Amino acid sequence: MAPRILYVVTEDWYFLSHRLPMARAAEAAGYEVHVAARLKDGRAGIEKEGFTPHALH
């Protein structure tokens, strides 16, 4: 089982614009990447990267 990392940000777009390079590096290092955020238009981008989204309400 791969280690997991959880990014917690307020908005999905913020993750994609500011944390994506770090998340890609974590995945390349063998981590399973999860993202907790308010999910709107950026959800598809998070899923396209192969990361697991979690909705914050």
Language model features: what each stretch is:
Residues M1-R38:
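N-terminal subdomain of nucleotide-sugar transferases
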Residues A28, V33-H57:
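Conserved nucleotide-sugar phosphate-binding/catalytic loop shared by glycosyltransferases and other
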